[in-house]
């Protein structure tokens, strides 16, 4: 790794160092230490000679491999940490209200006024707390006082808490702010129900969906992801305001969240009937814990992939046959299939690993979506 001089103190530092270890100055590389080409601070390798400007991490490795599939030249606009930088900051009620006021001609910002570095989320945590505060008394009412009237509330709150929380995260990250919240709810409720019905129709066909076998588990991934991708595509085709990758992430997440919430409610009820209260409560906790890496993430990838291959063209049927879209849709299918396979690791290690992989893909698409903002500004200026 080459050495460069710190602009602040003049000491020699590694070219990959983000801050000077001597004086703490934030180091922004403007030229490649190897060939001297001018570069952006967001690039991980020199576009001219390929010299590594940053140490490779999981994000870089995933991005490089996904670039080979998509043909994109991704850039790191934000890290996973950046997306949550405002979570624990103090916010006013007015700021909270403004988050949900968007989607109309008056409340949708012009692309030239959007700063991709502003992408962050914080309302999702408040939503999760609301669910938690509502879940506790329903649980007490049913478990401690034996009042069956609390059971429907316990099931619905337990099933909806995490999928809705993750959905709100995607809603906040869509800084185009061009999809009103009522439409997000529409995609969540209708999309979840329609994709479930479509999946049931697929299950009624003569497929091997026995998750005790590897082939059966993989087929479950096919049978459940194709219906979700179909409904996501339907909504994206119908909503002419959806033009960007971040829109695809949001619409996909909404459909996936609806699918996850309704499916989880069914699992909670079924396990409660067959296994009793303790089993039911275990399912609530387990499904909630694993929700961020499941249906919400998988459907979000499908939506983002479709909007990526569209680029700045009007969405067309030809994009559904685009090789890049089809290859990217294999990712959630494989992730889902492996998730259901009879592979046991301690502490649900397999599902945690798959969650991390899914979110590395999502971060990749978030960065492509933020890069698209700069690309859109150039496109509009032509």
Could you describe each region identified by the protein language model?
Residues 45-382:
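Hydrophobic alpha-helical segments at protein termini of multi-pass membrane proteins
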Residues 1-64:
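Cys/His-rich metal-coordination motifs, chiefly Zn-binding "fingers/knuckles"
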């Amino acid at each position: 790794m080459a050495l460069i001089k710190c602009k602040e103190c003049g000491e020699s530092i590694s070219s990959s160092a983000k801050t000077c270890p001597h004086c703490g100055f934030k180091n922004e590389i403007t030229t490649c230490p190897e060939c001297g080409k001018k570069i952006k601070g967001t690039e991980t390798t020199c576009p001219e000679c390929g010299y590594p400007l940053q140490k490779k991490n999981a994000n870089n490795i995933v991005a490089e491999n996904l670039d080979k599939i998509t043909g994109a030249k991704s850039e790191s606009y934000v890290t996973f940490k950046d997306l949550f930088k405002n979570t624990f900051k103090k916010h006013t009620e007015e700021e909270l209200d403004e988050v949900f006021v968007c989607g109309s001609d008056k409340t949708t910002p012009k692309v030239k006024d959007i700063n991709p570095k502003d992408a962050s989320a914080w309302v999702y945590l408040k939503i999760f707390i609301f669910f938690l505060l509502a879940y506790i008394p329903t649980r007490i009412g049913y478990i401690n006082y034996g009042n069956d009237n609390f059971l429907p509330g316990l099931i619905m709150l337990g099933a909806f808490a995490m999928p809705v929380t993750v959905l709100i995260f995607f809603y906040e990250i869509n800084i185009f702010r061009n999809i009103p919240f009522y439409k997000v709810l529409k995609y969540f409720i209708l999309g979840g129900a329609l994709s479930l019905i479509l999946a049931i129709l697929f299950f009624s066909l003569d497929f091997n969906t026995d998750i005790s076998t590897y082939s059966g588990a993989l087929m479950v991934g096919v049978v459940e992801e194709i219906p979700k991708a179909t409904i996501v595509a339907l909504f994206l085709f119908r909503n002419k305001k959806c033009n960007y990758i971040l829109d695809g992430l949001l619409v996909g997440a909404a459909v996936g969240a609806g699918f996850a919430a309704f499916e989880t409610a069914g699992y909670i009820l079924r396990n409660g009937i067959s296994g009793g209260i303790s089993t039911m409560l275990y399912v609530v906790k387990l499904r909630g814990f694993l929700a961020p890496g499941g249906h919400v993430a998988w459907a979000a990838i499908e939506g983002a992939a479709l909007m990526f291959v569209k680029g700045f063209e009007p969405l067309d049927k030809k994009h559904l046959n685009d090789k890049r879209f089809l290859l990217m849709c294999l990712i959630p299918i494989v992730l889902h299939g492996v998730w259901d396979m009879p592979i046991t690791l301690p502490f649900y290690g397999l599902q945690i690993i798959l969650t991390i992989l899914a979110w590395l893909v999502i971060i990749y698409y978030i960065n492509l979506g933020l890069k698209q903002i700069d690309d859109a500004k150039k496109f509009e200026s032509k």
